[in-house]
Amino acid sequence: MALKELRIGTRASQLALWQANWVKSELEKRYPDMTVTLTKIKTIGDKILDVPLAQVGGKGLFVKEIEEAMLRGEIDIAVHSMKDVPTEFPEGLGLYCITEREDPRDAVISNNVKFADLPQGARIGTSALRRQAQLLKVRPDLEMVIIRGNVQTRMDKLKTEGLDAVILAAAGLNRLGFADQITELLPTDLSLPAIGQGALGIECNLSNQDVKDAISFFNHPDTSRAVRAERALLWRCEGGCQVPIAAFGEVTGDELKLTGFIASVDGKVSVKGVVTGPADDCEKLGVKLAEQLLSEGGHAILAEVYQREVSREKEIPV
């Protein structure tokens, strides 16, 4: 093991620090003589908290500044929530490891009221257009309230903003020790997860073989294939993290099942599909499903979503 030091770049949120510290701890266990340090970096997604992410626009809202630090040689690796990682990287950088997935489902936090039992016109807090579209599809009576901030802040808004429920990723709640706050886990056929939800990604300079050798043990092959399929679908749809596109890959043996979903923001128009095939062909399967969804109405849906996004971007000073 040639490396004596490894510098990790991370956002400063509670969840991001948990994730980065987990990577740090695993590295220290594996390489007791290595010095592992954390550098906290504020991203544009962290700085703009009073505007819904979909209105901020653009891609890489939670990674761009971290990648810039890597390009300047200030950090060696970056730890990301996979659902925040764009499908394209700056030249020389790339995703080298995808960790084993935590629970990929969405979780309901409420006053012990399950989703199906929420009252007519219930106010639901969420940060994702993907969730909003899918839940409105089955419950058009709901009022969606866009909430921002870290996990604890969003949970607190159940009371501070008079919400009936808050929808968050189960993975983050589990990692931070909030599993006991979950009222219900939504099945994936009701709320298909975000691309990469529940998995962590480790990005590095792809020319640094010592760093790649040091972190390679983090990669979980089945999760990697599933997430690569999901990301290929997103790439083919030219989608960012803040559009109503969802995908979920499941690997069983050598087979991959990929489910994808594209919807209008209000959930009134949507298209959903499934493909299966060899797990080693994960990215081809992702592109195949994307093209199927686009041809069945997804292209028109996304054109309208992106047009709305562009018009809103012009109104927001960043």
Swiss-Prot record:
Enzymatic reactions: 4 porphobilinogen + H2O = hydroxymethylbilane + 4 NH4(+)
Required cofactor names: dipyrromethane
GO biological process: protoporphyrinogen IX biosynthetic process
InterPro entries per the UniProt record, alphabetical: HemC, Porphobilin_deaminase_cofac_BS, Porphobilin_deaminase_N, Porphobilinogen_deaminase_C, Porphobilinogen_deaminase_C_sf
Molecular functions per Gene Ontology: hydroxymethylbilane synthase activity
Protein name: Porphobilinogen deaminase
Pfam families associated with the record: Porphobil_deam, Porphobil_deamC
Misc. remarks from the entry: The porphobilinogen subunits are added to the dipyrromethane group.
Family: Belongs to the HMBS family.
SUPFAM superfamilies referenced in this protein's UniProt entry, alphabetically: Periplasmic binding protein-like II, Porphobilinogen deaminase (hydroxymethylbilane synthase), C-terminal domain
